[in-house]
């Protein structure tokens, strides 16, 4: 480890505790509040939102709520009471929200789990009573449900978690009431445990107030661990937990005809492609603490498509997981991160988007498929866009003191078809080629608490059937990762954590060479003293690790210091997401928050951060520092700003396997703000920019406006535009012995002017809490123009000489292509890098939950795509051309039915 790296960490470790001393001693923590639950008895409880059954009077009330915001620690401005009953099969919660101005209660309609500007009442149950995991059930005054799962003591949450439960509300002149029925089968608990953790909360939208029964203040450490206790749950057994949700769907795809005029008929083209499907989801309680969730032939047609993007860098784009099976209950599979505030681009050890990914083999047509046709031969192909998931299963819950999670999925082999024709249109050959092999994906996660220490372990495994002779050279046969992590609470505010993980990938020599040369590693770099491609290897192994010290609570000061490494051979990309290996980095963050409202502000805060990183050869890759600040005004507007700077360092990725280059010093900034979120019309804006010492620069703005013209309708418009100039934009690279100064590898760059425009539009129309229509449209245009072609002529250059400065020529043809003749006698080459990419994405989703757990989806999706080898046309013209670009429509009807 370089001396400067060690020095920074040593200074950070000594400085952070001193800076983090609170301005006053923390208050002494009293014992938890307690609430006695009452037995519901044999008389039926009518779920009507009135709490008029006599049994409700036998339950003790929880009252005396305390504000979390806007005045932390102050008594709630309006009285609230909560009571709990229990029966053999359910928990009942009654909440009464008194309001002296009941006519001002905010009660808009929206979809379940939507972020509404609304009053809200909720109960949170820590049924494990582990002070780390809890289930939230909430409702607004007109019956819009909200449920979510908290884990890691509330530091993380799963908003996609949807349970099967009921709630009814009522309103009167004195306020409103909510009556919940939560089946025991939807919770996880240990039979015989008569005490759970519990929290009750209420939001009053017009005043921006949130109050809770067991006080949770902004300066507190944790969330679930601060709950009160629900006692008296006598005789809770293990209810039957079996849920079966079959589905049937029908999808019709109308695709454009892109054949050349007069060409042979495409045997795979159909104006409308019909595809019926059926499958089933299953949830089975193996015990009161352990659940099996499975899906067979899953369908995710109702999930919104990924936004269009243009990737001009070598890094893979990270795509958000949206598929319900892989999002719900993912808390158990959270691992691979130490507790810190510093963002250090660590490998993500589990990335479920790998399951069911796009097929990886592109060139599946044999090279001689159209030999008989000569130059006039035409080849038509048809390949799937996604890999079919045959089935997947999760087991999650607890076995004694151990929290356990197991995930397994199997994907089908996928084949592409091809047909070749001669110049007369007569078929020459017809065949198919494997584009994705049969694969299995497995994840195991376990953790347990030992006093103030949490110890965990995890493993991932990918196995592929590579018996097809075309595949062993394309991808590994087997890939695994093993991880061990530990977290120790030194005090209520201080947490030390760390992890170590190892990876092992095996496959053919060609596959392992591909991994060595891939962008995260680039073993082929000619001036890397510690790396080199080994073409005889059939495996690749490596390690990654991280340690961190975090101050996670306190009246004002928070912070963390952390250090991490990833060895050159570590690879988690078969079931994870990793943008680079060969990395050592560290950083420190010091945070100050003021959460007590005074005068013109409700809260304000800021942080300072610094970090640096090297590779294993000791090259300083980055060194940066910055400041961030935010303020919440008394009128409920918000503002934030940041300013960052980085020093001149070394870039070992810019040339994509070529020589090292210097990375210029630069600065970046952003300024943002938002208006009062309680209003019918609310907005936000975000301006960002950057510049560096060699002349690269960028500026962008994103704005948003959301209007609620009626209580059940919300319209949002979110345009964004950016423009920039890049002095060193990668174009291409190839071997050329004449490029002696760069070890026979010629890497071509250019100056590039780039700009992008997008505008997302959303309409949410809610007819009832269970019937809604969502509309979405997003046009997208990205342009790039290239000039002043240049090449590095030696390692560690900051400014690359242009082709003309190096004695060569660059001649542009009428079609926009540029032919470059190097001045060192190398072979000429031609490039056509200018581009305009257009896309229009739209969808409409009608969702009707016609009974709890059962839904009907009617979906329409539209996609238009266009490309031009010209980056000069204005945005307005390109938006007009979108109307003429090839169009694909997808229509889907999906019906699910819940048995349980």
Regions picked out by a protein language model, each given a short descriptive name:
Residues 269-270, 313, 383, 430-437, ...:
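Alpha-helix capping and helix-loop boundary segments enriched in small/acidic/polar residues
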Residues 89-91, 133, 176, 192-196, ...:
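Outer-envelope beta-barrel architecture signal
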Residues 238-293, 441-531, 589-591, 596, ...:
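Surface-exposed extracellular loop regions of Gram-negative outer-membrane beta-barrel proteins
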Residues 20-449, 456-457, 466, 885:
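Structural preference for beta-rich elements and adjacent junctions enriched in aromatics
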Residues 6-15:
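Bacterial N-terminal signal peptides
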Residues 388, 499-900:
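Exposed, low-structure sequence patches enriched in small/polar residues
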Residues 1-5:
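Positively charged n-region of N-terminal signal peptides that target proteins for export
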């Amino acid at each position: 480890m370089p001396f400067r790296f060690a020095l920074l960490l040593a200074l950070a470790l000594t400085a952070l505790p001193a800076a983090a001393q609170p301005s006053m001693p923390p208050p002494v923590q009293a014992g938890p509040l307690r609430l006695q639950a009452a037995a519901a008895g044999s008389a039926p409880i009518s779920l009507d939102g009135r709490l008029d059954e006599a049994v409700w009077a036998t339950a003790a009330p929880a009252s005396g709520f305390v504000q979390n915001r806007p005045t932390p620690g102050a008594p709630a401005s309006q009285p609230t009471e909560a009571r709990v009953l229990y029966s053999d099969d359910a928990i009942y919660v009654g909440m009464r929200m008194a309001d002296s101005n009941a006519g001002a209660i905010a009660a808009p309609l929206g979809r379940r789990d939507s972020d509404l500007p609304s009053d809200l009442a909720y109960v949170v149950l820590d049924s494990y009573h582990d002070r780390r995991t809890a289930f939230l059930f909430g409702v607004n005054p007109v019956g819009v449900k909200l449920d979510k799962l908290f884990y890691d003591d509330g530091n993380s949450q799963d908003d996609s978690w949807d349970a099967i439960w009921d709630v009814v509300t009522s309103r009167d002149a004195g306020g409103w009431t909510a009556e919940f029925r939560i089946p025991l089968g939807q919770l996880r608990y240990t039979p015989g445990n008569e005490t759970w953790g519990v929290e009750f909360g209420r939001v009053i939208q017009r005043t921006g107030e949130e109050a809770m029964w067991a006080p949770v203040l902004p300066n507190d450490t944790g969330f679930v661990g601060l709950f009160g206790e629900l006692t008296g749950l006598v005789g809770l057994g293990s209810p039957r937990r079996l849920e079966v949700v079959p589905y049937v769907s029908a999808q019709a795809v109308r695709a454009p005809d892109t054949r050349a005029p007069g060409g042979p008929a495409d045997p795979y083209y159909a104006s409308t492609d019909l595809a019926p499907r059926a499958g089933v989801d299953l949830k089975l309680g193996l015990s009161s603490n352990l659940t099996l969730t499975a899906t067979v032939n899953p369908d995710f047609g109702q999930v919104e498509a990924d936004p269009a993007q243009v990737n001009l860098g070598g890094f893979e784009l990270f795509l958000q997981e949206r598929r319900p099976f892989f999002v719900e209950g993912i808390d158990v599979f959270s691992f691979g991160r130490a507790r810190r505030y510093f963002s250090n681009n660590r490998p993500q050890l589990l990335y479920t988007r790998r399951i069911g990914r796009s097929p990886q083999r592109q060139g599946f047509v044999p090279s001689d498929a159209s030999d008989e046709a000569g130059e006039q031969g035409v080849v038509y192909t048809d390949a799937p866009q996604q890999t079919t998931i045959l089935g997947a299963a999760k087991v999650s819950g607890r076995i004694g003191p151990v929290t356990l999670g197991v995930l397994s999925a199997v994907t089908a082999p996928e084949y592409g078809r091809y047909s070749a024709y001669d110049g007369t249109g007569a078929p020459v050959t017809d065949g198919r080629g494997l584009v994705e092999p049969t694969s299995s994906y497995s994840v195991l996660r376990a953790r347990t608490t030992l006093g103030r220490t949490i110890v965990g372990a995890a493993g991932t495994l990918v196995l592929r059937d590579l018996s097809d002779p075309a595949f062993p050279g394309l991808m590994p046969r087997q890939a695994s990762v093993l991880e061990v992590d530990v977290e120790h609470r030194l005090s209520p505010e201080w947490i030390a954590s760390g992890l170590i993980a190892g990876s092992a990938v095996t496959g053919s020599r060609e596959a392992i060479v591909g991994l060595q040369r891939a962008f995260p590693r680039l073993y082929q770099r000619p001036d890397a003293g510690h790396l080199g491609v080994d073409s005889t290897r059939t495996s690749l192994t490596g390690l990654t690790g991280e340690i961190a010290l975090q101050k996670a609570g306190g009246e004002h000061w928070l912070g963390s210091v952390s250090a991490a490494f990833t060895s050159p051979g570590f690879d988690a990309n078969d079931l994870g997401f990793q943008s680079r290996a060969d990395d050592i980095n560290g950083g420190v963050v010091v945070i100050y928050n003021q959460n007590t409202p005074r005068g013109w502000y409700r809260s304000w805060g800021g942080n300072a951060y610094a970090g640096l990183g090297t590779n294993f050869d000791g090259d300083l890759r980055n060194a940066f520092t910055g400041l961030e600040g935010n303020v919440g005004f008394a009128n409920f507007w918000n503002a934030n700003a940041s300013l960052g700077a980085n020093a001149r360092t070394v870039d070992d990725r810019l040339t994509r396997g070529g020589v090292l280059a210097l990375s210029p010093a630069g600065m970046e900034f952003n300024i943002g703000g938002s208006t009062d979120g309680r209003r019918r019309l609310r907005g936000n804006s975000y301006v960002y920019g950057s510049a560096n010492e060699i002349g690269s620069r960028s500026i962008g703005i994103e704005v948003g406006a959301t209007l609620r013209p009626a209580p059940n309708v919300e319209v949002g418009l979110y345009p964004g535009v950016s423009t920039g100039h890049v002095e060193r934009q990668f174009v291409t690279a190839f071997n050329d012995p004449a490029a002696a100064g760069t070890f026979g590898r010629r890497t071509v760059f250019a100056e590039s002017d780039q700009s992008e425009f997008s505008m997302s539009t959303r309409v949410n129309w809610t007819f009832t809490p269970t019937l809604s229509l969502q509309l979405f449209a997003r046009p997208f245009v990205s342009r790039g123009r290239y000039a002043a072609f240049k090449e590095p002529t030696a390692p560690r250059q900051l400014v690359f000489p242009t082709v003309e400065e190096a004695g060569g020529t660059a001649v542009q043809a009428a079609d926009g292509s540029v032919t470059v003749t190097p001045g060192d006698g190398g072979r000429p080459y031609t490039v056509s890098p200018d581009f305009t990419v257009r896309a229009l994405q739209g969808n409409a989703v009608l969702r009707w939950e016609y009974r709890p757990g059962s839904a009907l989806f009617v979906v329409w999706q539209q996609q238009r795509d266009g490309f031009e080898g010209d980056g000069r046309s204005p945005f307005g013209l390109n938006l007009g051309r979108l109307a003429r670009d090839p169009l694909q429509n997808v229509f889907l009807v999906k019906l699910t039915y819940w048995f349980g």
